[in-house]
Amino acid sequence: GSLYAMGYSPDDMVDLLKSEDFKRWYSGEVEEKYVYHFKKNLPTPEFFNIRFSFRDSLKSLKPQFLPTSVVNPIQMNLVFVDLYARATVACKGDFDKLFVPFRCIASDVYNKKQLIMKEGDLGDAVRASMSFPFMFKPIEIDNVLAYDGGIYNNFPTDVMKNDFHPDIIIGSVVSANPTKPKENDLMSQIENMVMQKTDYSIPDSMGILMTFKYDNVGLMDFQRVDELHDIGYNRTISMMDSIKSRIHRRVNLDNIRLRRMVYRSNYPELRFKNIIIDGANTQQQAYIKKEFHKSDNKEFSYEDLKQGYFRLLSDNMISEIIPHAIYNPEDDTYDLHLKVKLENNFA
């Protein structure tokens, strides 16, 4: 949805989903040319190790035996800058000003409520809205952890009505309420624990509902994109007469292609200059900055950012880096904001 709102065509989206880059993003794997940056830990006789911070009391020690997410966020933390930073600039943080107005839903599990994402950093909004618990690591927005919006509202027709007042809503249902959990199925147990029951319906007077049965499709089955695309396309074509009978507006295909091209051509190039770091002391900040540029005023590219990012994560001093790009219209560059989490090992 976000890609379409940014000016991607359906063909553009299929190409992206089938790309080798996308496979790395959702798997957390590092590209071959950056693997050499990573150092291997020296072999030790340890059976396992426990991490804790020396800055905290030993009484508050909480050994971490399990990862917080199945998918390593190392790729996703970085690529969302490349995918979404320029679109955030183009719409000035107002999702109504994207190529197609956009909403997505995230969940504040602490306060037990949905978060309607309609402004701010587009990448953060999308990242939060897709962070299914235990599968993807959540992100922090306004000091709360934000998860997949489907926990509280998996079919937000109410949001679309209230925000956009559409004449017609076309709803696509590709999910269902969780079935009874099975003893040996962890995902079904998690779904039942976290997801609220959803009303997947649209009154005939309000719109058109298309329902798909994907019982054998998993959350990470991106390799089946052609199969799933064809199912969706064929189902839509079979309903096209009824859709056209209710939607009378027509748009020239060449015109929409041109409009997409013009909109995306206005995205400012990712050129970075200033670096702002949170989570490190003065000496550590100086060390981190040197990985990206040698002088304070020198600009660097996204490729430079990518190389420095993987180098920093290779030295076992930093456990995670969460980058954000903030645009400076005065000189057409971006400030690079880095939220850094340092390693504290005790083995």
Regions from the PLM with identified roles:
Residues 2-321, 325-327, 332, 340-346:
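Patatin-like phospholipase
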